[in-house]
Amino acid sequence: LTDLHDLVKRQFGLNAERYVSSTDHSKGESLDRMLELVDPKRDWRVLDIATGGGHTALAFCTRVREVVATDLTQEMLDAAERFIRGKGVTNVRFSEADACSLPFQDAEFDLVTCRVAPHHFADCARFVREMARVLKPGGIAAMIDNLVPEDRATADYINDFEKYRDPSHVRAYTATAWLRFFRDAGFQIEATETFRKARDFEAWAGLQTVGDPAKVELMRRLETAPPGAAEALAPEWRGGKLFFYLTEILVVARRTPSHP
């Protein structure tokens, strides 16, 4: 676990500013939909786990009392704080934290968010239990992450593809697995939606400063993917640029009052 934490910190510490400026992370249909489904209230305290560039924290902070933005990587927190403070925001505070072992009391928050980060976590079932623990009874968890197809061989191919580009990638899960994690942690599922997002290959590889030999290999894996992965990733050349698709899942769930 320490090795994974060190790897995540190294990968994202080196690339923190790229994630702040990344259009893939700063906006998108799934973030807009998360806001719409959650419908945050003015008196809420919100925890944003693995805030990255701070885009989710920024999206929610104008609608709630306070956002606590956490990340495992201090350089990422520093970059997010500069970005958010630069917008004149004063109701977001920042805290270094491990998503699977949160340094907060039970039942502290009205809402917990986490967006496009859990595929880096060592234990996603534990992460969901931690969300449940720090939520007030009846509180809401809203999570977005990369999604893989239910077929195991296809899921493995896509995860291996992601891990080749970013060694801190642990695993993207299926919809079935995510719903099990939430239900096992005592959540009632309120909504699930999926989104297909086109990725510019060069921009996607550039987020992790991938070198030319690795880019060639990633391109080869895209263009020679077996049928299931080829259907999911759907690589295509447009205007001399290579694009492919990743799928995201949005889960909005409520902590049941009876859950311990």
What are these regions, as identified by a protein language model?
Residues 53, 124, 190-260:
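Conserved Class I S-adenosyl-L-methionine
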Residues 171-185:
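Short alpha-helix
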Residues 1-44, 55-59, 76-79, 86, 140-164, ...:
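Conserved class I S-adenosyl-L-methionine
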Residues 47-101:
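Class I SAM-dependent methyltransferase SAM/SAH-binding core
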Residues 125-140:
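A short glycine-rich, Lys/Arg-flanked "PGG" loop and its adjoining helix->strand segment in the class I
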Residues 110-123:
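A short SAM/SAH-binding and catalytic strip from SAM-dependent methyltransferases
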Residues 100-111:
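A short acidic, Gly/Pro-enriched loop at the edge of an enzyme's catalytic core
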